[in-house]
Amino acid sequence: AMMLGTAGFTALLCSFAVKAKEELLLGEKVKDVLVTGATGGVGSIAVMILSKMGYDVHAVTGKKDKNDYLKNLGAKNIIGRKEFEGESKLLEKGVWDGVVDTVGGSALTKIFAQTKPGGIVAACGNAGGIKINTNVMPFIIRGVKLWGIDSSGSSIKRREFVWGEAAKLIDFSKVQSFTKELSFTELLETYPKLLKGEFFGRAIVNPNK
C-alpha cells in the first residue's frame, strides 16, 4: 500500500476528476489527456491510470532519457516541458479534453488556453510555482474548469471508493518497478537529487534497512 501512498491516492483523485467531464457533466467523451510532471510520483501513477481508463495520455517531462519509461506506463505521446514555457495567447487551439497538472506555475497559463470546451484541469501540485498568470477567456468562452485536488481533505466515504477502484486501475508490478526502498542514510543522500529534479518515481523509507 505504501508504494502508492498519498501520491497514488492523489493520482486517482485527479483521474476521476478528468473522467467527470463525461460522467458527471455529461460532456463529450474524453480522449486526449495531458499529464505534467509525468515522471514524478503522482504523474507516473496518473499516466498509468488514465491509460487504463482508455484515454490517450500525453506525458510532459523535462527528462529526455525517460521516454521509454513513460511509454511503458501507457503514455501515447511524450512532450518536452519547454513546449509550455513562454507567452500564451488568450485562447489557443483546443487540444486537451482533460489535464492532470502536478506542477503548477506558469505552465498552467498555456494549458488553460489549450484545453477544449468543457475540459477539466485537475491541479494538485506547486513544484513549478504557486502563482498563475491567466485570463478568464478559457473559462467563460470554453467553459474550462479548474478542479483543485485536496487529497488530505477527502471524506472517509470518498477514500473508501477511491481505494476500492485502485486494484482495477493500477498495475502494481509497474509501480514496484519505479519504487525504491531507502534506508534513513540513503534518504539523506537522495534529498539533493530531489531538489535538482534528478529523482523520479516513488521512494519508501524502510527503518529496518
What do these predicted regions represent?
Residues 37-38, 103:
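NAD(P)H cofactor-binding loop motif with strongest signal on the N-terminal glycine-rich segment
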Residues 10, 41-42, 106-107:
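Hydrophobic/small residue at the entry helix of a nucleotide-binding pocket
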